[in-house]
């Protein structure tokens, strides 16, 4: 079997993967900030790094996979205040929803799933070390900031120089910072901050900045120098750049050897995002499509390429997955172990070892399906199931998949005034802090093809999906 090669964002090239310790891989992936339901962009990240850890294990590595949860953040605080609920109530609810979405998509849970609030002492320890090493300072407003000009290699991941950033980036002015590009490590608490959002420190009551959370959790759980760090392309700068500056400023050694970034999800050639109003939650998609169809839709595109979201592409994914299941119908696969010397297995492995080239791996599945259709051979059927299983696919009985209800959920014919009445009932439920009833109304509307979007200030918009 060929050696695994990974596209390393830091090197801007594919490199042969060599773990720091033979036979072991330590991998950290930036997880989700839990203040709302996961959207399709989150789904892509979750599926991509699920594939990565599955393949690493399949080729014999012992993997420690850490994916964090950000459970303290300005967005979380704002949402909790809007809802009139505690931070813990909000984050627990959306962590549960995230786990439900993951289970539906066949995503294996990471080995360790730390919450940021569980590692406050480690974050403060790293901040104090950065201060001792000359990289951090407490500003006049009480915040503790990182001095980017003190870190000689700032910009090595993103390729952005400090001069370019100062000339071209829009940076919010802050008179308390020594440089507008400096970023916060510790935010001084404000009088209006709700309970449960501040911790005691030598710098005063406050909470961690977003970037220090991942540095501290990664170094604590995987060591100060580990193999792979992953996340969405949008995290490359500034989040991952700042992680490098923090971690290497604190430890004096290389933080991570291989940086992996998955591409954006696009709608009509624009990035899917809440600010553009063109995003869909996983739950909205699963109201209309089987979860394995959604997973297949993500898997068949290379992880670094843009993923174009549309009903047409999801319908095509459903038809393609149906072809694979149809090939297995009425063929009893044998139960032998997977033989990597088999030609299809070799082609599949070569694709996956070439920077997780899932389009070529999926093409190999269709080659196998064609041969199964032609020969009805039990050995080929077994290979098809085994190789697809490494991608988290074809795990059900073919008839169970093929007999399921297909097609999009039909709109229930609700008139606009009926929809508005249900929204009003949901608002009343939220005001009464009956969040279960509010969630039930949202789900009921989704079943009829109506998606809700809560806006800042308490208003709610709806659209047909």
Curated annotation (Swiss-Prot):
Its EC number is 6.1.1.16. It is found in: Cytoplasm. One of its GO terms (cellular component) is cytosol. ATP binds at residue 274. A motif ('KMSKS' region) lies at residues 271-275. Keywords: Aminoacyl-tRNA synthetase, ATP-binding, Cytoplasm, Ligase, Metal-binding, Nucleotide-binding, Protein biosynthesis, Zinc. Zn(2+) binds at residues 30, 214, 239, 243. SUPFAM superfamilies: Anticodon-binding domain of a subclass of class I aminoacyl-tRNA synthetases (SSF47323), Nucleotidylyl transferase (SSF52374). It comes from the Bacteria. A motif ('HIGH' region) lies at residues 32-42. Its cofactor is Zn(2+). Coiled coil: none annotated. It holds the Pfam family tRNA-synt_1e. GO terms for molecular function: ATP binding; cysteine-tRNA ligase activity; zinc ion binding. It catalyses: tRNA(Cys) + L-cysteine + ATP = L-cysteinyl-tRNA(Cys) + AMP + diphosphate. One of its GO terms (biological process) is cysteinyl-tRNA aminoacylation. Binds 1 zinc ion per subunit. NCBIfam families: cysS. Belongs to the class-I aminoacyl-tRNA synthetase family. Monomer. HAMAP family: Cys_tRNA_synth. This is Cysteine--tRNA ligase 2. The lineage of its organism: Bacteria, Pseudomonadati, Pseudomonadota, Betaproteobacteria, Burkholderiales.
């Amino acid at each position: 079997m060929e050696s695994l090669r990974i596209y390393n964002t830091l090197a801007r090239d594919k490199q042969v993967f060599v773990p720091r310790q033979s036979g072991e891989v330590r991998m950290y992936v930036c997880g989700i900030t839990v203040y709302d339901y996961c959207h399709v962009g989150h789904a892509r990240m979750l599926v991509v790094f699920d594939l990565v850890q599955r393949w690493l294990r399949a080729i014999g590595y012992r993997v420690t996979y850490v994916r964090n949860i950000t459970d303290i953040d300005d967005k979380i605080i704002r949402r909790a205040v809007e809802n009139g609920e505690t931070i813990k109530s909000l984050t627990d609810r959306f962590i549960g929803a995230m786990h439900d979405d993951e289970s539906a998509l066949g995503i294996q849970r990471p080995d360790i799933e730390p919450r940021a609030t569980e590692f406050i002492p480690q974050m403060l320890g790293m901040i104090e070390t950065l201060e001792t090493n000359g990289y951090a300072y407490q500003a006049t407003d009480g915040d503790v900031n990182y001095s980017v000009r003190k870190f000689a290699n700032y910009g090595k991941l993103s390729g952005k120089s400090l001069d370019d950033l100062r000339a071209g980036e829009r940076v919010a002015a802050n008179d308390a910072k020594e440089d507008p590009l400096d970023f916060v490590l510790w935010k001084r608490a404000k009088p209006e901050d709700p309970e449960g959002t501040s911790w005691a420190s030598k710098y005063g009551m406050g909470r961690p900045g977003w970037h220090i959370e991942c540095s501290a959790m990664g170094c604590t759980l995987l060591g100060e120098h580990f193999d792979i760090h992953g996340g969405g392309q949008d995290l490359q700068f500034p989040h991952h750049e700042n992680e490098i500056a923090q971690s290497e400023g604190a430890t004096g050694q290389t933080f991570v050897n291989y940086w992996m970034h998955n591409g954006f999800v696009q709608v009509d050639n624009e990035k899917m995002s809440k600010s553009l109003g063109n995003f869909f939650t996983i739950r909205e998609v699963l109201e209309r499509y089987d979860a394995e169809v959604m997973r297949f839709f993500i898997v068949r595109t290379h992880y670094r390429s843009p993923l174009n979201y549309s009903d047409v592409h999801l319908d095509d994914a459903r038809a393609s997955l149906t072809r694979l299941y149809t090939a297995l119908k009425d063929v009893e696969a044998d139960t032998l172990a997977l033989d990597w010397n088999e030609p299809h297995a070799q082609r599949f492995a070569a694709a996956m070892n070439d920077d997780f080239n899932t389009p070529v791996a999926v093409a190999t599945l269709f080659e196998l399906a064609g041969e199964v259709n032609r020969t009805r051979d039990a050995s080929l059927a077994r290979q098809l199931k085994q190789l697809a299983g490494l991608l988290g696919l074809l795990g059900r009985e073919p008839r169970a998949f093929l007999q399921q209800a297909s097609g999009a959920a039909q709109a229930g014919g609700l008139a606009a005034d009926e929809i508005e009445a249900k929204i009003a009932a949901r608002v009343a439920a939220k005001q009464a802090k009956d969040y279960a009833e509010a969630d039930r109304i949202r789900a009921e509307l989704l079943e009829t093809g109506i998606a809700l979007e809560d806006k800042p200030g308490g208003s709610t918009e709806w659209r047909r999906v």
